[in-house]
Amino acid sequence: MGIICEIVGSCCNKRYNLGYNYPFIFGLKNLGNTCFMNSSLQCIFNSNKLIKKLENIHIKKNPKLRLANEISLMLNDIKKGQIFIDPKNIKDILGEVEEKYKYFEQNDANEFITIFLNELLKELNGIGEYKTENIPKDELEKKAFNKLEDKFFNKNKSFLLNLFYGRLKRQYICENGHICAIKFNNFNTLILPHPEDSNDIVDLLKVYQKNKSIDDTIFCNTCQSEKKYSIKTLIYNIPDYFILCLEKETIYSYSGLKYPKILETKDFTNNSSKYSLNSFIIYIGDRERGHYTAKCEKNNNWYHFSDANYKIIEENNIHDKNAIILFYEKI
């Protein structure tokens, strides 16, 4: 028998059978300025592939998997009918990683997401399969690719890599247009610039990949001398969940972000994949004080989560000009 719960807000007095199926619907207790954490967790837990993977591993048999075990316990509580969850233990675990999470001050949601995923990755090292994708054929690129593979991906092998971790390719280009060096870096959230002439997410992704001049020189093997150079950053691999954030310095002044329900990677990369908007985080406030909430798609309905409270919303009310972090899921 499924869980029966009342959805408050725009559809009050209606009751919905939420069942035991993914994704789960629940509120999170605000422990004191922890809306940044609650909204982040709502979006992360809306990643169905992650939840299904965690449920299929023997978490409780491994005491080292503290964060994964806490997620498992929370999901078990939801299955038993709880629709109000206390995330204190998750906060305490991350407080041992980052001291600021021991306290009750407002923090940045995008930073929390990065730290949460990195800590979960450490715990899940060696658990599940990891598939290497898009190995380059060019020898210079392949050498740089394998360097990151050995340094990061092979040392953190886990199913979490394909879900949340992508690769950036950085080309170091001299003033005469020669590629002097190539480096690969990993990412789990992509922090985008916000140019004054556009607020469209696809435009921001294009600007992110433009050449950026560096006030320095680099040795160019082709020119056989030190040359001024620029760096071109390319989005090389995109994981199953593509997390996009606005730069911290610009979220207080922009006029509203435009983002599609379906994001096509061919519009900003050489790859052709489609991603569907899975959830996103909203911030209303200024640098000193504000409130984070989340909107998530669950069972073909959209919900707005504000800590312990949540409500179902109409599809034409999904878009929000105050969105600052977007979660896209590969279709």
Regions found by a protein language model. Give the residues of each.
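Exposed substrate/partner-binding surface patches
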Residues: 2-23, 44, 53, 57-63, ...
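Glycine- and acidic
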Residues: 21-25, 98-101
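Short N-terminal secondary-structure initiator segments
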Residues: 22, 26-45, 127-140
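Generic detector of ordered secondary-structure context
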Residues: 27, 32, 63, 67-70, ...
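Active-site nucleophilic cysteine motif
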Residues: 28-43, 70, 104-115, 289-292, ...
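Carboxylate-rich, divalent-cation-coordinating active-site regions
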Residues: 35, 174, 244
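Papain-like cysteine protease catalytic cores
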Residues: 46, 50-186
